[in-house]
Amino acid sequence: MFGKILTTSLLIAMTFAAPSTEEGKSSKRRQYIAPLAGAAQVPRNPLFFAAPALPVAAAPALVRPAFAPVPVAAAPAFAPVPVAAPMVRPMLQQPAIVAPVAPVVAPVGQCPGGPSLPIECDPKRPWPQCPPQSYCYATNSVDIGPYFCCPIWSTYGAAWRPATPFYNYVPPVPANWPDVARMTANWPAAAVAMPLKARKQQKNEGDDEETEDEQKIGSAIDGWVERQAKL
């Protein structure tokens, strides 16, 4: 029993006394660790690779002479008397009155169904002045003009000048009517009952008398009719 304990203690002592081979191998082994993406490679010894320190120049010191004269401002010959400036009152300026500028309005004619487009045109060459879906129309006079481009919807589907007057046309009151008649007349209903003055046929005095030639022609025609009746 005592021998076993002695043997065990010797083995333990030899184990601690023997040099460790794993430590020697681990000291010689160098493990490489990959740096992270974007990380700077820092050297092992930063002091060895550091840039040499540059000498810093000292700031120049201002040195004055020991017995430098102190500058003294010379006193003026006479002191100016302060004069109070007159107080200027602010003048109220009235804003300038700007006349309103009238907008430039293009000339517009009158189409059968409403106002025309502000585009003048030539009836012989309506294109390209008049845009599509429009036609050239004389708004004042058929021969003189002026001619403006009228949209086709302004004539309710008819792209030509109607021959009959418009249904909403109202003739003016006669100029020779007195003021009382104008006020009492139910215009334009009164214009419907106004009879139109018929033009009398002019007759001359010599129209009833027949000439000799007409009498000869009439007698010849009558004789021919009688002869044809006897056959």
UniProtKB/Swiss-Prot annotation:
Signal peptide range in chain numbering: 1-17
One Pfam assignment: DUF5346
Keywords on record: Signal
Region (Disordered): 197-231
Species for this entry: Caenorhabditis elegans
InterPro entries for this protein: DUF5346
Protein name: Uncharacterized protein T25E4.1
